[in-house]
Amino acid sequence: MPIKLKGKIVSGLGVGAKYVQLYRGVFNKYLGIDPYPGTLNIDIGQDFFIYTKKLKAKIIPPPRKGLGCVLAYPGILMGIKIYVIKPCITNHGRNILEIISDKNLRKTLNLKDNDIVEIIIYDEEDYSYI
């Protein structure tokens, strides 16, 4: 069963583009998307993993030694298919959702810091029905 979360758009740490580029090949292989080089960050104000205990993530292996795996949860943000990614090694708190898509979400959806958005997150096995 999908979960719905609301959160606030926030600026990231400025390294999302670098890491999306590093993981681009494995995101393409395991998720079937060629991601935009960057992430959209959403602060949900609480620990994300409280909500995901009932959801199965897709585990993305690291593209090379020295990097960690990534948990990927499929979802929908304002009508656009996305993935919530939770890197196993990160400087973000558990309250921050990092979102990847094949689109520049800030530009496509005209989002600014402090905008409130709702995101629907699915079990990775249910995503094919969207």
Swiss-Prot record:
Ligand binding (CDP): G12, L13, G14, V15, G16, A17, K103, N104, L105, R106
Reactions accelerated catalytically: riboflavin + CTP = CDP + FMN + H(+)
Residue positions binding FMN: T90, E98
Keywords (A to Z) from UniProt: Flavoprotein, FMN, Kinase, Magnesium, Metal-binding, Nucleotide-binding, Transferase
UniProt cofactor(s): Mg(2+)
Keyword Kinase among record annotations: yes
Positions of Mg(2+) binding: T39, N41
This protein's pathway: Cofactor biosynthesis; FMN biosynthesis; FMN from riboflavin (CTP route): step 1/1
GO process annotations (BP): FMN biosynthetic process; riboflavin biosynthetic process
Enzyme Commission number: 2.7.1.161
GO molecular function: magnesium ion binding; nucleotide binding; riboflavin kinase activity
Gene3D superfamilies according to UniProt: Riboflavin kinase-like
InterPro entries: RibK_CTP-dep (IPR039063), Riboflavin_kinase_archaeal (IPR023470), Riboflavin_kinase_CTP-dep (IPR023602), Riboflavin_kinase_dom_sf (IPR023465)
Cofactor: how bound: Binds 1 Mg(2+) ion per subunit.
Keyword Transferase recorded: yes
UniProt superkingdom: Archaea
Family of the protein in this entry: Belongs to the archaeal riboflavin kinase family.
HAMAP family: Riboflavin_kinase (MF_01285)
Biological role: Catalyzes the CTP-dependent phosphorylation of riboflavin (vitamin B2) to form flavin mononucleotide (FMN).
Official protein name in the record: Riboflavin kinase
Native source organism of the sequence: Staphylothermus marinus (strain ATCC 43588 / DSM 3639 / JCM 9404 / F1)
Upper taxonomic lineage: Archaea, Thermoproteota, Thermoprotei, Desulfurococcales, Desulfurococcaceae
Name of the gene: ribK
